[in-house]
């Protein structure tokens, strides 16, 4: 009996170690568990995707309810010669909480870009991609569901996923310094109906250095604002002609521990709330802080705690106001590298006020629960 018991214990320990290794690999990879569709004669194509089945519980009617979606994408590359490689990536999101009669309403292209990699001399790509400021913002955007929302925003200049960006990236500083990476980016003008999602011509820079689990980085971006953005100036809307962001971050990722913090300031850039037409306001200035701590247990559990705050400055007659402030407590349990479940509790620290009511800034808590299958 003892021999059988010891054998069972060894098997359990082995499985726990396999789960831990799988989860660590999953978290470290940009696109995880991709299915290799084709790999021959220097041409490679990987398919990846996930189904994110989740529900929000909140007193905020705009947040409460089903939030299920699915994503599908591919990454491909072709070896042109021993020094030059072509690559491309596309990713799309399908909403799972819409009725069939609504069709593809709110489905969206998340990524779509192509480029060339020149051996140790770096890579260049163009299309819909992440802005270089997100190189720092990504360090704290790791919570089970929420997080990364004080200043990194989609289609808001170069702080998140955005369109029309030409990006140069260099890894390990021309192959000379391991862990030292930098990027330069240019974004062309995008004048859309919604002023808060428009941008003028701009550029961005980022640099990060990682060594034995420790990381430090900084990013800067500056853009012209469109005429419509400047004309939309109001009590709560920024009037400046340029949008600007700088950000710095620190992180530690080793020994099953993940710690990260970022600080940033933005000018005429960060969106918040909602006006009468359903468009977001744009803050004159914000000061933003994010910090997160996580631990990966060998049996698959990854608890997480974070604090996030964004302070809006010079908001017309309202002066300085908190735009975002909450504590996030959550956990993810990985059954294996393909299946996980999570719970995430966003404890909103904002109080109801004349400002939150006028700007329609939510002050309610949210609990998110869900299952995630990915390949």
UniProtKB/Swiss-Prot annotation:
SUPFAM superfamilies noted in UniProt: Porins
Keyword Calcium annotated: no
Example of a GO cellular component annotation carried by this entry: pore complex
Topological relation to the membrane, as annotated: Multi-pass membrane protein
Pfam families the UniProt entry points to: Porin_1 (PF00267)
InterPro entries hit by this protein: Gram-neg_bact_OMP (IPR050298), Gram_neg_porin_domain (IPR033900), Porin_dom_sf (IPR023614), Porin_gammaproteobac (IPR001897), Porin_Gram-ve (IPR001702), Porin_Gram-ve_CS (IPR013793)
Signals that turn on the gene: Expressed in high osmolarity conditions (at protein level).
GO terms under biological process: monoatomic ion transmembrane transport
Membrane-spanning segments: none
Compartments (UniProt record): Cell outer membrane
Keyword set includes Protein transport: no
GO molecular function terms listed in the Swiss-Prot or TrEMBL record: porin activity
The entry's keywords: Cell outer membrane, Ion transport, Membrane, Porin, Signal, Transmembrane, Transmembrane beta strand, Transport
Gene3D superfamilies for the chain: Porin
Reported consequences of knocking out the gene: Slight decrease in virulence in male BALB/c mice.
Segment forming the signal sequence: 1-34
Family (UniProt): Belongs to the Gram-negative porin family.
NCBIfam families listed in its UniProt record: PRK10554.1
Physiological role: Forms pores that allow passive diffusion of small molecules across the outer membrane.
Subunit: Homotrimer. Mixed heterotrimers with other porins are also probable.
Annotated protein name in UniProt: Outer membrane porin OmpD
């Amino acid at each position: 009996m003892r021999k059988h018991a010891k054998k069972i214990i060894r098997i359990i320990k082995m499985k726990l170690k396999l789960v831990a290794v799988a989860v660590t690999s999953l978290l470290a990879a940009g696109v995880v568990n991709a299915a290799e569709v084709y790999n021959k004669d220097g041409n490679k194509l990987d398919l990846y995707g996930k189904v994110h089945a989740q529900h929000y519980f909140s007193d905020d009617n705009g947040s409460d309810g089903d939030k299920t979606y699915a994503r599908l994408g591919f990454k491909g590359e072709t070896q042109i010669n021993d020094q030059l490689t072509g690559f491309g990536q596309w990713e799309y999101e399908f909403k799972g909480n819409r009725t069939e009669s609504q069709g593809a309403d709110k489905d969206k292209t998340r990524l779509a870009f192509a480029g060339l990699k020149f051996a140790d001399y770096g890579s260049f790509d163009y299309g819909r991609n992440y802005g270089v400021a997100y190189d720092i913002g990504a360090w704290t955007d790791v919570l089970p569901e929420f997080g990364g929302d004080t200043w990194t925003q989609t289609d808001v200049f170069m702080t998140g996923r955005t369109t029309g960006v030409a990006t140069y990236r260099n890894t390990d500083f021309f192959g000379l310094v391991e862990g030292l990476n930098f990027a330069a980016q240019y974004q062309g003008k995008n004048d859309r109906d919604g002023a808060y999602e428009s941008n003028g011509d701009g550029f961005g820079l980022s640099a990060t250095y990682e060594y034995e689990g420790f990381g430090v980085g900084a990013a800067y971006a500056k853009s012209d604002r469109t005429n419509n953005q400047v004309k939309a100036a109001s009590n709560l809307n920024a009037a400046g002609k340029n949008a600007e962001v700088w950000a710095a971050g620190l992180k530690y990722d080793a020994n099953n521990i993940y710690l990260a913090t970022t600080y940033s300031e933005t000018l005429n850039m960060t969106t918040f709330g909602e006006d009468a037409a359903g468009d977001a306001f744009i803050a004159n200035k914000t000061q933003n802080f994010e910090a997160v701590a996580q631990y990966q247990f060998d049996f698959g559990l990854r608890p997480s705690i974070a604090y996030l705050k964004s302070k809006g400055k010079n908001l017309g007659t309202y002066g300085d106001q908190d735009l975002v402030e909450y504590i996030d407590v959550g956990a993810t349990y990985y059954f294996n590298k393909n299946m996980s479940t999570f719970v995430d509790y966003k404890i909103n620290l904002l109080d109801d006020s004349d400002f939150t009511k006028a700007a329609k800034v939510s002050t309610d808590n949210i609990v998110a629960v869900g299952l995630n299958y990915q390949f």
